[in-house]
């Protein structure tokens, strides 16, 4: 298995006293960014400071490079939230995932609280849209056209589909081979040591780039629409080979 490495976003900031005591630091930082150095020096040379003595010209150029290197465009941000994000967060990318993640040292510097609030909003919108679609599909599958679903029944069915319980997880795993070392997710086939880990994976899978919760919601929708049909198929089938799992209806 490959080794994981954490990449730090930025190094520690340099104080103003250190810059005044060691001016060569800024020149070394400026040489590492040739575009900034090239654009900063000619602008200062073309300014009225060119008529000053050489010792004052060096001070002016030094101040111009300092202002250019510490500008907000060249850093991650000078706000208080940006400083916390730079100091406490790192970038982590697993070998099996095409996505990169922010790993923070504490909850206060979590990127979702500062620069990425749309992640939680999109997750909530996605969950609400899925629950509404499931409720509408259940209502539209009624045998008679006169029977309409009221608002209360729709809300109850929506709440039932949103909550994935331990009983639902165990019921979905009946059509899979028995696992002795843990619990297997019926959607992505990943193994987890305990049932609580599997429940948290299903609940927070959206942040990993996929959502196994959708799979379990569709299973619950099928079970709620025709529970007697699943029970009749199970009793009529004499062996497991003749029994069709509800997962085949989702494909």
From Swiss-Prot:
Annotated signal peptide: none
Gene (name only): SPATA46
Protein name: Spermatogenesis-associated protein 46
Pfam families: Spt46
Superkingdom, taxonomy of origin: Eukaryota
Function (record text): Plays a role in spermiogenesis and fertilization.
One GO CC term, this protein: nuclear membrane
Localization (cell): Nucleus membrane
GO biological process annotation, one example: cell differentiation
Keywords for this protein: Differentiation, Membrane, Nucleus, Spermatogenesis
Species per Swiss-Prot/TrEMBL record: Macaca fascicularis
Major localization listed first in the record, in broad terms: nucleus
Residues passing through the membrane, by range: none
InterPro entries registered for this protein in UniProt: Spt46-like
């Amino acid at each position: 298995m490959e080794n994981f490495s954490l990449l730090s976003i930025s190094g520690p900031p340099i104080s103003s006293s250190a810059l005044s005591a060691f001016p060569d630091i800024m020149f070394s930082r400026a040489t590492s960014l040739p575009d900034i150095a090239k654009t900063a020096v000619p602008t200062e040379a073309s300014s009225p400071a060119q008529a000053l003595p050489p010792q004052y010209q060096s001070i002016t150029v030094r101040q111009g490079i300092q202002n250019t290197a510490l500008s907000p465009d060249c850093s991650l941000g000078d706000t208080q939230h940006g400083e916390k994000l730079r100091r406490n967060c790192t970038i982590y990318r697993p070998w099996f995932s095409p996505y990169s993640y922010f790993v923070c040292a504490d909850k206060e510097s979590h990127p979702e609280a500062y620069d990425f609030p749309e992640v939680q909003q999109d997750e909530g919108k996605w969950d609400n849209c899925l629950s509404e679609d499931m409720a509408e599909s259940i209502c539209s599958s009624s045998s008679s056209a006169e029977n309409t679903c009221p608002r209360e029944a729709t809300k109850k069915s929506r709440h039932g589909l949103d909550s994935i319980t331990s009983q639902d997880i165990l019921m979905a795993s009946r059509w899979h081979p028995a696992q002795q070392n843990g619990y297997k997710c019926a959607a992505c086939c990943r193994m987890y040591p305990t049932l609580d880990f599997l429940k948290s994976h299903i609940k927070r899978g959206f942040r990993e780039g996929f959502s196994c919760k959708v799979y379990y919601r569709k299973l619950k929708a099928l079970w709620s629409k025709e529970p007697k049909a699943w029970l009749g198929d199970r009793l009529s089938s004499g062996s497991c080979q003749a029994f069709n799992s509800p997962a085949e209806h989702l494909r």
